[in-house]
């Protein structure tokens, strides 16, 4: 019991006295457990309950809903990116090391509120997966997708609770920028085949994500060598570790989705081109161009041979001479 009491007292001290008092009364900020529960519920719905409910149902037609939803996410992401720019990253923040401003100045409060709205945006992104399930696009509900969406609210919660501003908000600054393009792509893709043919740049969204994680790694891990601004180093470890994990998850996805597939497609095109040439030749009664001369020569010789051998005017000695000549050819 003593250990449990010590743990509880330490936990309450961490939540009540060590956290940022400015965000303490924000929605869902009193404890991490509601956020954890919501994230676990999300994972259960998209991997278990949702597919079960859709098992005997036809996929929903959500084209118009998807266009509106993704347009709203583009606007939301653009606003969050703007707030992160005004809050610091294009307005005085130092890329080398930036402390958290715990004051109640308008700029500091605006940054803290922007961090909370970024946290809230991670819940709105759950609808990406809900719509996949409703459309029975289960191939899109990958482990990478669910891990990425399920972990983010919990991860961001700690940042809003203890460090709503400063160095680690660089992650949100980049992430909202990438999401502008990502949701713009989804919005355009939902408009149908007439627009989809112009979306050749899909794979570069994944490249942008990976570049984002590399930049976050470099930005976070630099504090291990020199922490001039006394930023809480634990959060640098935390953000950097997330960036490493997500980088490898997205890198593996990119290799499976594009590198290996492109290799298979090239091999398939090469094989099909070779095979289709022969299939067409057989179907049309022709032969491959490289053997046409030999085949046509054989065809002419064989025709002359059969004509001569069947000619009743030829005597036996002449037939024998024709047979010998054909054998020599």
Curated annotation (Swiss-Prot):
Give GO MF terms, alphabetically: fatty acid elongase activity
Top EC group: transferase
Pfam families recorded for this chain? ELO (PF01151)
Cellular component terms per the entry's GO annotation: endoplasmic reticulum membrane
State the compartments where it is located: Membrane
EC number(s) reported in the record:
2.3.1.199
* Superkingdom of the organism of origin: Eukaryota
How does gene deletion manifest?
A: RNAi-mediated knockdown leads to lethality before eclosion. RNAi-mediated knockdown in neurons leads to neurodegeneration in the central nervous system including degeneration of retina, defects in the fenestrated basement membrane and ommatidial disarray. Effects are probably due to altered levels of very-long chain fatty acids (VLCFAs). In contrast, glial-specific RNAi-mediated knockdown results in no defect.
Ordered alphabetically, the record's keywords are: Fatty acid biosynthesis, Fatty acid metabolism, Lipid biosynthesis, Lipid metabolism, Membrane, Transferase, Transmembrane, Transmembrane helix
One example of a Gene Ontology biological process annotation: long-chain fatty acid metabolic process
State whether keyword Kinase applies.
no
Give the membrane topology, semicolon-separated if more than one: Multi-pass membrane protein
Q: Which reaction does it catalyse?
A: a very-long-chain acyl-CoA + malonyl-CoA + H(+) = a very-long-chain 3-oxoacyl-CoA + CO2 + CoA
Q: Where are the transmembrane segments?
A: 26-46, 66-86, 114-134, 146-166, 170-190, 205-225, 233-253
Which InterPro entries does the protein's record reference? ELO_fam
Primary role = Catalyzes the first and rate-limiting reaction of the four reactions that constitute the long-chain fatty acids elongation cycle. This endoplasmic reticulum-bound enzymatic process allows the addition of 2 carbons to the chain of long- and very long-chain fatty acids (VLCFAs) per cycle.
Q: Which family does it belong to?
A: Belongs to the ELO family.
Q: What is this protein called?
A: Very long chain fatty acid elongase 7
What organism, scientifically named, is this protein from?
Drosophila melanogaster
Which lineage do the record's taxonomy fields give for this organism?
A: Eukaryota, Metazoa, Ecdysozoa, Arthropoda, Hexapoda
